[in-house]
């Protein structure tokens, strides 16, 4: 029997080249010279673990929060919904006056706050086949004397050019507040997913309190097609702004949460740009006042997490009865500083961990360290990230920039294996699969457990069996070729045996 020891840090490669557009997260309030505890923050994923640091900034970050890095993880520009600023925090040429109107005048000018709205109110997409052009998509809020009459009435696009040494051109906003759609739109809920070709994008947002969606095709020519589709149930108007809408990392499912509604699940065809099926996941909110319901999906697409104020739930999306798989993986521990650090907005990080805003304007993010592990072993660390200043209840929303074409989707993030930690010897478990990540083949080492031939099964993230081989008695290892399988995350198991299942990453 072999015992393997990892003595170095291994970074799982996700593609043949770096894609680090989401490696810098910005949050926090504008600085006040008389109080350094009230200022900006940065979470930098170029460090392992990610580095949380103080950052002097004149721009307040709130619910409208988007940033963009280059492929090496260097910050290029960001927006708080009021202005567009560069990495030096200076407003880009023509970068002022984003989202014009009475909400801008009140929040951005009078109060010097960041732009409000719902979770996922803006996002940035790189222009396909361009090295320095980007589109910022963002929604405008219109205020009325009766706050309940306030609406999002426009979806805008703004084009940003980043200067390069080759062209000697300065970074500049080439066009701003171009009207992409005028309608009564949902609060936040602006998402994007790669086209099946792995290059173009689909941009999606619903109408307000509606099951009607606008779907836009974004290519190197800009927005080239617009579709409408009605599918599923109507959200409850009382839950407006208290949920989150996210794609699974592989882009096959869209999850939408609303108060007083089950989780709404939409199957999405990345080639056609349309929803093909609607389902729901019913769940128990627990013994607490029904409030916000935010969500995230694990890197392998296997587990859904619902962030519900005092409770954090996990669901197994491969279970025969998903609702019955509901598991409480964390409960708020009662900490407040000064506000209760409950569970709120979620975002999958580029390090394969899920980060959760801890309540409102506190100094913390919660962390799910192992989101692809079932049950409490997913390892939720409350207040796992502490900032020097309050976050302003702010967290950016990112699409999966690393998603590839439909036949080679890749993996959405880069996990880090800890150093100086011995792997479990074969004698302590019935099966060992290596190398992991794998390239074109794996070795399966196993022990005779039940005196009979066992079956080794390998599944893709859709739950489809892609390998089924017999592990004959009388030998202890078997070589399994994988050259025909696409890069990505897979799951293996030996039915009927305990501790005989796990995750396999194929990366070339």
Task: Briefly describe each language-model feature range.
Residues 4-13:
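Sec-dependent N-terminal signal peptides
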Residues 6, 425-434, 438-508:
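C-terminal outer-membrane/trafficking sorting elements
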Residues 14-18:
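Sec/Tat signal peptide C-region and signal peptidase I cleavage site
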Residues 19-280, 288-418:
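Beta-propeller fold recognition
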Residues 203, 245, 254, 263, ...:
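Hydrophobic beta-strand residues in large extracellular and virion-surface proteins
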Residues 417-427:
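Intrinsically disordered, low-complexity linkers and terminal tails enriched in Pro/Gly
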């Amino acid at each position: 029997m072999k015992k393997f020891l990892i003595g170095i840090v291994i970074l799982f490669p996700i593609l043949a080249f770096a894609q680090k557009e989401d490696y810098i997260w910005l949050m926090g309030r504008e600085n006040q010279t008389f109080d350094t505890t009230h200022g900006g923050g940065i979470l930098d994923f170029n460090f392992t673990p990610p580095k949380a640091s103080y950052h002097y900034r004149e721009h307040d970050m709130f619910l409208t929060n988007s940033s963009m890095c280059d492929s090496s993880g260097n910050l290029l520009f960001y927006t708080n919904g009021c202005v567009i600023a560069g990495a030096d925090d200076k407003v880009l040429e023509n970068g002022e006056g984003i989202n014009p109107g009475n909400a801008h005048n009140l929040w951005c000018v009078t109060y010097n706050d960041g732009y409000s709205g719902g979770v996922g109110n803006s996002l940035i997409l790189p222009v396909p086949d361009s090295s320095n052009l980007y589109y910022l998509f963002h929604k405008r809020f219109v205020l009325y004397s009766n706050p309940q009459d306030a609406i999002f009435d426009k979806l805008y696009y703004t084009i940003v050019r980043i200067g390069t040494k080759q062209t000697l051109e300065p970074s500049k906003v080439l066009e701003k507040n171009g009207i992409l759609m005028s309608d009564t739109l949902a609060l936040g809920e602006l998402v994007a997913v790669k086209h099946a070709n792995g290059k173009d994008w689909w941009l999606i947002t619903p109408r307000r309190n509606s099951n009607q969606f606008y779907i836009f095709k974004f290519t190197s020519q800009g927005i080239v097609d617009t579709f409408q589709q009605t599918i599923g149930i109507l959200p409850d108007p009382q839950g407006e702004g208290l949920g989150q809408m996210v794609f699974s990392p592989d882009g096959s499912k869209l999850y939408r949460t609303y108060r007083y509604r089950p989780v709404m699940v939409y199957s999405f065809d990345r080639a056609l740009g349309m929803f093909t099926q609607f389902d729901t996941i019913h769940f128990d909110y627990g013994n607490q006042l029904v409030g916000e319901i935010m969500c995230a999906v694990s890197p392998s697409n296997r587990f859904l997490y619902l962030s519900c104020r005092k409770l954090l739930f996990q669901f197994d999306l491969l279970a025969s009865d998903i609702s019955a798989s509901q598991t409480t993986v964390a409960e708020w521990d009662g900490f407040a500083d000064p506000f209760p650090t409950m569970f709120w907005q979620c975002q999958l990080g580029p390090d394969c961990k899920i980060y959760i805003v801890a309540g409102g304007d506190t100094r913390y993010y919660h962390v799910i360290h192992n989101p692809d592990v079932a049950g409490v072993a997913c390892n939720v660390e409350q207040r796992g990230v502490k900032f020097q200043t309050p976050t302003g209840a702010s967290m950016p929303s990112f699409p999966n920039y690393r998603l590839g074409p439909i036949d080679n989707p890749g993996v959405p993030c880069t996990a880090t294996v800890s150093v100086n930690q011995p792997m479990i010897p074969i004698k302590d478990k019935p099966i060992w699969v290596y190398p992991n990540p794998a390239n074109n083949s794996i070795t399966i080492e196993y022990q005779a457990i039940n005196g009979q031939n066992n079956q080794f099964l390998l599944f893709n993230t859709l739950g489809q069996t892609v390998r089924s081989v017999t592990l004959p008695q009388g030998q202890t290892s078997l070589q399994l070729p994988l050259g025909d399988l696409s890069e990505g995350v897979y799951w293996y198991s030996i039915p009927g045996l305990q501790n005989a299942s796990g995750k396999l990453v194929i990366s070339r």
